[in-house]
C-alpha cells in the first residue's frame, strides 16, 4: 500500500471561518427579485467566471447585492489538476474580483478541465496517485500565494475511475488538505452521486475527511437513471441526500450550507422554500448533536 504523506509543503495559512448560515447560488434569473424582496437568505455564492468583466449588467447587480449580503466566490475554470501551467491572467482577474466584493472564501473544484489549452467545459476527476497528490499540492500553493488566502476545493461527482488510483478519493482529499493547507468544500450531493456510481459507502467518504478543513457544504439535485446517477443541479434535493446532509451536520457541527440550482429554474419562492427546508433540517441535526455532546 502506498503511504499517504501528511508533512506540510509549507505552513498552512491560518483562517477563522464561522458558519455563514444558509445561502443560495446567485443566478441572473433572480437578480431583480433579490433586490426587490431582500429575501431571508444569509449569503450568496457567485460563479466567479460570470463577473470577470469590465462593467455591464452582471457587475451592476453583483455590486448591488454585495452591499446587502455576504458573498463567496466559486470558480469552474481553475483546472487545478490539469497538465498545463496555471493561467496567471485568470488568477489575476480572480484576485481583482475578490478585492472588489471581499468574499468570505474562494473555491473551485478538485479536477482538471482544460486540454490542449482549451476549456473542456466539464469537471473531470484526477487519478488519485502519489504523483498527482504532490503535483496538485504544489499548484495549490501557487494559487494561494497569488490569492493570499487558502483555496477551498470541492469534490466533484464522478462516473469513471482511473486504473491508476492508489488512494480512495477521501484519502486523497485528506492528504491534499494536510499537504497544501487548502480547505474543502464538501458537496454532499456529489458524494451521494459518486457513491451510487462506484458502489462505495457515502458516509465512509464523509467520516474520513478532516473536519477542521471543511468550510462549506453544497446541496443540489440530480437525475437517477437506475444503473447510474448524474449530477444535474436541475432538480430539488432528494430525500437520501437530505438524510446524508443531516448526518453530516451532526458529525461536523454548523457549516456554511449552499443550495445550488443551475437549470430548470423554479419560481424564486420555491427555491426559498427549499432553502427553508435545509435550515429546518439543519437545526434539527444540530440540536441532536448538542443533546449527544
Which residues does each predicted region cover?
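N-terminal pre-domain/capping segments
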Residues: 12-96
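Acidic-and-aromatic substrate-binding clefts and catalytic sites of carbohydrate-active enzymes
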Residues: 31, 48-60, 79-89, 159-167, ...
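Non-cysteine beta-strand/loop elements that form the S-adenosyl-L-methionine
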Residues: 104-112, 184-186, 211-223
Amino acid at each position: 500500500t502506498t503511504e499517504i504523506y501528511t508533512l506540510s509543503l509549507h505552513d498552512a495559512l491560518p483562517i477563522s471561518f464561522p458558519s455563514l448560515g444558509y445561502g443560495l447560488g446567485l443566478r441572473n434569473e433572480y437578480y431583480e427579485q433579490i433586490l426587490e424582496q431582500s429575501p431571508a437568505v444569509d449569503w450568496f455564492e457567485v460563479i466567479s467566471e460570470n463577473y470577470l468583466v469590465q462593467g455591464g449588467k452582471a457587475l451592476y447587480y453583483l455590486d448591488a447585492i454585495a452591499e446587502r449580503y455576504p458573498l463567496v466566490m466559486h470558480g469552474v475554470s481553475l483546472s487545478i489538476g490539469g497538465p498545463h501551467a496555471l493561467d496567471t491572467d485568470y488568477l489575476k482577474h480572480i484576485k481583482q474580483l475578490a478585492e472588489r466584493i471581499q468574499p468570505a472564501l474562494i473555491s473551485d473544484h478538485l479536477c482538471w478541465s482544460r486540454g490542449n489549452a482549451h476549456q473542456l467545459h466539464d469537471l473531470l476527476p484526477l487519478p488519485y496517485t502519489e504523483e498527482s497528490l504532490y503535483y496538485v499540492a504544489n499548484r495549490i500553493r501557487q494559487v494561494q500565494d497569488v490569492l493570499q488566502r487558502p483555496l477551498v476545493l470541492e469534490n466533484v461527482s464522478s462516473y469513471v475511475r482511473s486504473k491508476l488510483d492508489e488512494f480512495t478519493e477521501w484519502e486523497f482529499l485528506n492528504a491534499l488538505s494536510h499537504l497544501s493547507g487548502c480547505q474543502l468544500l464538501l458537496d454532499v450531493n456529489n458524494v451521494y452521486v459518486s457513491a451510487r456510481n462506484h458502489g462505495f459507502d457515502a458516509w465512509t467518504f464523509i467520516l474520513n475527511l478532516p473536519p477542521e478543513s471543511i468550510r462549506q457544504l453544497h446541496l443540489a439535485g440530480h437525475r437517477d437513471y437506475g444503473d447510474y446517477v448524474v449530477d444535474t443541479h436541475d432538480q430539488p434535493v432528494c430525500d437520501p441526500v437530505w438524510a446524508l446532509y443531516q448526518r453530516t451536520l451532526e458529525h461536523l457541527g454548523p457549516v456554511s450550507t449552499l443550495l445550488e440550482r443551475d437549470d430548470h429554474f423554479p419560481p424564486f419562492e420555491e427555491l426559498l422554500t427549499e432553502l427553508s427546508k435545509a435550515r429546518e433540517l439543519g437545526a434539527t441535526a444540530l440540536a441532536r448533536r448538542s443533546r449527544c455532546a
